[in-house]
Amino acid sequence: MNSPIQLHKKFSTTVWHVLSWILYAVGAGPTAIISMGVYVPLIVMKNAHDHGFLRTDHTIPCSLYPEEPCSLNIVGPLWIDVSSIVFAASAISTFLQMAMMVSLGVICDYGNNRRYILFSCVIIGSISGIILSWSPSSFLLGKIVFLILVDLNFIISQSCYDSFLPIFLRFYPITRGPITLESALQDETDDLDSYITNTTIDSSEEEPYLLEHSLILNESAPPADVEDEHKAKIAARLSSVGFGSFFGAAILFQIIFTPILYKTNNNPIILPITVTVCSCWWLILSTPLCTIVTLPVENHSSDAILTLLYNSVKESYHSFKHAMSISSIRLFLFSRLFINCGIQTSLSSAVIFGKARLNLSNFQLTLLGMGISSFALLGTVIIPYLTEYFQLNSLQVVMIISILLPMAPLYGLLGYIPGFENAGIRTSADVFRATLFFGFFLGGAHSYCRSVYAQLVPSGKETRFFALYALISQTGVLFSHISLTLISNYTSDLRAVYIFVIVVMTLPLSSLWIMYQHSKTPNLHRSSS
């Protein structure tokens, strides 16, 4: 087995590696934002509506009354609202994602499994999207299965994709020079000697150490040296490049296809064409990272796949117990679960209920998706500047965003209060205003949550703790989809959705406030423990 020094000599990160990583983000963006975010759900809902019956009597075909609430018979006496179909399929997909994340995270670390699994997921996801788009309307059950496959394989591939960057950073050659894409990676790379000789803190001492040294938890902590601060800024910029490439490519595709959809008067054939183009784009641009880029083989195992699966589940359980024993991580993971749940609920309901309840056209929904992407990208650029201007840390930014995000559903609920009948979300213009406001804080919520968590994770245990972070985030998504399925299936009143989102998005505030109080008076935690 190769030692770390031998691996470092044999493998060296180049600009091509990083460009391949960014290229994947350019390919995945249109699939996530346009295809999976808007067009695939619309195709499935349209097919479900064609096979459904009015919700009021379950006998009159929905095709005769396209604007009335519609239900679909699943089996026997079980009926489900058409808008709930996508939520239910997404809930099944998210549950499968959580189950697979527990095992695949460990398997990817052995041999070349990371590349193989990534490319397999991209191929299956791309082909599933194309088949879903062009299959006949009578193939409704098959479309739902392919919807689950597209969503499942995209999320799993995204998890594999995220794991490439730490490897590129660790094996980048250490040189000194001006700040470029290369030097940014070089600055983020740890010194090889410290990588080899690094020792981790005993688990019983981790929490006191975090409280004493983390600037997130203790504002009076010893300041980090200039190099560490510089490296943190460079890491944030690199993350922004990937995030910007992801949304930038989606915006470019929306600029191309939105006028086409408008010129063809919302011709439904544009939807499968767009999904096909996005799927092929994702497959083509993922090829360099999956096939050409080679990584060092750091871990070997002669164990069978089933043994690796068992060990990975066991390791994930111990990681969960370990994380829950550290109060700061426990509090933040609780906050992250509900923040992600609120975000996912708001974005999903904007598209699905915009179509089902407010009868937004495909063109309007495409514009809405473009607005979300554009404002999310705008927020990613502006929020860091505001953070530096007001000298805020990452935890304070997350708190502010968590306070502002519930304002959108609160505005929607306002229209149901006597005396405010003209307010609320009642027209397409109202949907655009509320969603764009929400979209502006979308990028900041995700990036700053990741930044806070990165400063809480014990040294030497980053991989397993970030796998837990992804698992908690997906738990929030699962909770969102199940809740929306139940709400939309039992009531057509949007007040239930608004109230649910407000409650979910205010729950994290108490945990974030406790963490903030620890940063002001770190001894408070020790005296209470």
Swiss-Prot record:
List of glycosylated residues: N198, N218, N299, N359, N489
Membrane found in the keyword field: yes
PANTHER family: AUTOPHAGY-RELATED PROTEIN 22 (PTHR23519:SF1)
UniProt GO molecular function: L-amino acid efflux transmembrane transporter activity; L-amino acid transmembrane transporter activity
Name of the protein: Autophagy-related protein 22
Transmembrane segments: 25-45, 72-92, 130-150, 241-261, 269-289, 365-385, 397-417, 429-449, 467-487, 496-516
Membrane topology label: Multi-pass membrane protein
Family, per entry: Belongs to the ATG22 family.
Keywords tagged on the record: Amino-acid transport, Autophagy, Glycoprotein, Membrane, Transmembrane, Transmembrane helix, Transport, Vacuole
Domain of life of the native organism: Eukaryota
Main location (coarse class): membrane
A Gene Ontology biological process term: amino acid transmembrane export from vacuole
Any Gene Ontology CC annotation: fungal-type vacuole membrane
Record function comment: Vacuolar effluxer which mediate the efflux of amino acids resulting from autophagic degradation. The release of autophagic amino acids allows the maintenance of protein synthesis and viability during nitrogen starvation.
